[in-house]
Structures are given as C-alpha cells and as structure tokens.
C-alpha cells in the first residue's frame, strides 16, 4: 500500500509555446508551437504531508521537455526541490512527482521516457496579481504575465495559476 499524501498551496505552470498553449485545447495532441515543449510546473506547498512527514513550506519545480506532441510521450523530466527541504522531504516529493504514490502524476508517468534526476536549489517565488516568476538557483526560471480578462481587467483571461489541492481527494 502506498503512503497517503496531500499537498495544497500555490501552483504555477508555463511553457515556451505561444499563447494559448495548444496542449490545453487538444488534450496534449497538438504539435508545440515551436516544435518542442519546455515547461516548468511549480508548487509552493503551504500545507501538506506524506504519511507523518510535514511538507509545509516545501517548494519544487518539475521541468518537462518533449519533442513533438506531449501525448506521444518520451518526455524528459527533472525535479528541482528547494534547498531548505530535508532529505526525507526531498524523497517524498520525488515519490509524489514520479507518480509512484498515486495522484495526478501517476497518469503522466507513462509518458516519461527519461528521468533526469533530482537537484536541489534555492527556489524563489514572486507572485503578483497578474504575474509570477520562479527561479531555481541557476537551474531554471519560469514566469508569465497574464492577459487581462475583458470582463474584469484585474483577473487573468486564462492562466494555469491555482491555489488548490494537488493530491486526489
């Protein structure tokens, strides 16, 4: 039986495709707008656990690179965990992000062809109303400025920017 886990907090993702990413409207079947997809999926956990281990305060970035449509698989995936995380927290985040303990990444794990490993770096998250930026030391940076909604210019038209539970309920 796998370890029970739950995480909640701020989630951000962005890729190098033109707006709007074709994966979103084609269930990952379209060609990336620049031939390959380079994406960063960021989670800043405010509350969470892996069994009895607290994951509150842990930040991590899942880096994904694909050639061609994401649905075709053979993704290269790497994980960057904040350098303030304990060794046990890094192991737990690795298990969650690999899909080995269920949750959203379990379905995506079949698409991964190459796991590039886990690195540790200082992760800084800057989140404003209509933008975010994340740096993971010298390893990665992810950011976006949202397009204002016509109905409410202070809200984004569309953005994968959530405060939500990442684990299955």
Describe the predicted segments one by one.
Residues 35-106:
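Aromatic- and glycine-enriched beta-alpha-beta binding-site module
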Residues 157-160:
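Short, hydrophobic/π-rich interface segment
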Residues 20-26, 42-43, 58-63, 113-117:
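Short amphipathic alpha-helical surface micro-motifs
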Residues 2-48:
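N-terminal ordered "arm"
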């Amino acid at each position: 039986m796998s370890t029970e886990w739950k995480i909640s907090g701020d989630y951000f993702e962005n890729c190098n495709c033109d707006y709007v990413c074709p994966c979103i409207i084609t269930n990952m079947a379209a060609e990336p707008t620049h031939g390959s997809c380079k994406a960063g999926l960021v989670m800043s956990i405010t509350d969470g656990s892996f069994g009895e281990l607290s994951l509150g305060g842990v930040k991590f970035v899942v880096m994904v690179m694909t050639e061609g449509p994401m649905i075709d698989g053979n993704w290269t995936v790497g994980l960057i965990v904040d350098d303030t995380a304990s060794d046990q927290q890094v192991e737990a985040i690795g298990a969650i992000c690999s899909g080995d303990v269920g949750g959203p990444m379990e379905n995506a794990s079949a698409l991964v062809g190459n796991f590039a490993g886990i690195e540790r770096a200082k992760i800084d998250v800057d989140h404003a109303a209509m933008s975010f930026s994340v740096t993971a030391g010298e390893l990665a940076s992810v950011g976006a400025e949202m397009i204002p909604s016509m109905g409410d210019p202070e809200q984004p038209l569309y953005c994968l920017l959530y405060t939500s539970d990442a684990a299955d309920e």
